[in-house]
């Protein structure tokens, strides 16, 4: 029993390291984007297509990861994805042509999709063995990694280090985290019958909710600063503060999320999270007032923070599909939301206004309190 407890604690730490490393590497890419664009001489339109390669690589890899994890367990896929990110971060900086950058980004995205699905499958298994909520804490480490990665790479570049040098430092740090995690990950045997990961049963509802939550997160990332400028609340140079407050609030909420889930239950977290996010969206649309808008972005982060971790936990407990396949299905559908959502917001904003398009997100978030009872009734 003592050995089992030690093994479980080690697996918890390894899972946190995997989330930290993945969030760190992904955030390291953000400050390197302008340098990669300049290196290949791509204009905005071409570079937009190149960034789409990253997303498509992730989308393709996710269901395949669920399939393979069902056969062999998540450990091998976590290591494949994690070390793939470590290897390809420097390569996306030095890719000499548009075509090689597109290929490198597709592989980088595939590695991201692989570790994203696999570490959530592993996290669900650890949570099940621990018999207590842990998913929000794991996702908090992704958020912490994101803050460290973006801040660290920005500091290195500002200090005069070359883009390749900064990328190599980021890869080395993430690689160390993966090396520490590797021997402590659960050695699951898999054994579930592999099958196509089309969501079905309650997993379909969870997947739709994940797509909505990811869509809102993507909208805040891609359109939040533009909304602040469009509303005449702040100049473009400072408009990124909205997303910063969103990210900080989300990280804080996830660090306390496991305690909240244990105290309130997953259904109440979905209800409260949806309502808080709806209130936040409404505040961002108050005309001519900056502080309500900034408070609104923070509330969106607080509300959305624990929704996706709860959905992943519920997917892993569903009897409609094997846990690994269910998590893969929810993750893949969620990423479709974050990829397609911002584009849909753009189309809606063009047809109406950005404020109206943002307001429509509140209507979508109403799905969480409305569906909470059904979605959280697993069994």
Q: What annotation goes with each model-predicted range?
A:
Residues 100, 137-185:
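Helix-loop-helix hairpin linking two adjacent transmembrane segments in secondary transporters
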Residues 61-73, 157, 253-265, 349:
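Helix-to-loop junctions at the C-terminal end of transmembrane segments
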Residues 31-45, 222-238:
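Short amphipathic helix-loop junctions that connect adjacent transmembrane helices
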Residues 60-95, 99:
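Conserved MFS/SLC helix-loop-helix module at the cytosolic interface between two early adjacent transmembrane helices
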Residues 41, 73, 94-99, 233, ...:
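Helix-breaking motifs and short loop linkers at transmembrane-helix boundaries and internal kinks
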Residues 114-128, 306-319:
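Intracellular juxtamembrane helix-capping segments at the cytosolic ends
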Residues 55-56, 143-148, 246-248, 252, ...:
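Short hydrophobic/small-residue motifs within alpha-helical transmembrane segments
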């Amino acid at each position: 029993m003592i050995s089992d407890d030690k093994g479980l604690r080690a697996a918890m730490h390894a899972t946190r390291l995997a989330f930290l490393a993945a969030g760190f590497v992904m955030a390291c890419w953000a400050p390197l984007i302008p340098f990669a664009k300049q290196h290949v001489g791509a204009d905005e339109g071409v570079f937009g297509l190149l960034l789409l390669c990253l997303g498509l690589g992730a989308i393709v890899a996710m269901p395949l990861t669920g399939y393979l994890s069902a056969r062999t367990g998540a450990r091998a896929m976590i290591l494949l994805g994690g070390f793939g990110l470590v290897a390809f971060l420097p390569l996306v900086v030095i890719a000499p042509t548009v075509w090689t950058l597109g290929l490198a980004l597709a592989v980088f995205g595939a590695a991201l999709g692989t570790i994203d699905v696999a570490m959530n499958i592993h996290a669900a298994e650890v949570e099940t063995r621990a018999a207590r909520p842990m998913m929000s804490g794991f996702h908090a480490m992704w958020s912490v990694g994101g803050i460290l990665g973006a801040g660290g790479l920005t500091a290195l570049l500002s200090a005069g280090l070359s883009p390749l040098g900064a990328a190599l430092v980021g890869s080395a740090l993430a690689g160390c985290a993966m090396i520490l995690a590797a021997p402590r990950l659960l050695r699951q045997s898999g054994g579930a019958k592999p099958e196509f990961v089309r969501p079905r049963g309650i997993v379909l509802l969870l997947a739709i909710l994940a797509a909505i939550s990811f869509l809102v997160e993507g909208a805040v990332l891609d359109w939040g600063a533009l909304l602040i400028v469009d509303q005449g609340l702040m100049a473009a140079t400072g408009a990124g503060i909205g997303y910063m407050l969103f990210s900080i609030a989300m990280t804080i909420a996830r660090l306390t999320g496991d305690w909240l889930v244990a105290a309130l239950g997953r259904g109440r977290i979905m209800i409260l999270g949806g309502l808080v996010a709806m209130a936040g969206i409404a505040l961002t649309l108050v005309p001519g007032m900056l502080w309500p808008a900034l408070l609104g972005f923070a509330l969106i982060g607080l509300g959305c923070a624990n929704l996706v971790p709860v959905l992943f936990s519920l997917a892993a407990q569903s009897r409609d599909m094997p846990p690994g396949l269910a998590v893969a299905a929810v993750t893949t559908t969620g990423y479709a939301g974050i990829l397609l959502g911002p584009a849909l917001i753009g189309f809606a904003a063009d047809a109406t206004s950005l404020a109206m398009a943002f307001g429509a997100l509140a209507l979508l978030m109403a799905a969480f309190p409305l569906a909470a009872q059904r979605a959280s009734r697993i069994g």
